[in-house]
Amino acid sequence: MPREIEWSDAEEIGIQLQEKFPDLDPLSVRFTDLHKFVTELPDFVGDPMKSTEGLLEAIQMAWYEEYKDAQ
């Protein structure tokens, strides 16, 4: 059974976003879109209202690391 993820699970979210959007450069994604992408992940159980700029930055950087590794 997949593990439920929250806003603080940046690394796992980054992995899942890379799997879902392998050709999308994370640095080109606006935070409003990133927020939507995260809240639509099937394992995400966090409160959509609890995101912060810092959490979104951490997720974006974790996703970017996965993106770079896949290139």
Over which residues does each language-model region extend?
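A charge-rich, low-complexity, intrinsically flexible signal that marks solvent-exposed coils, linkers
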Residues: 2-71
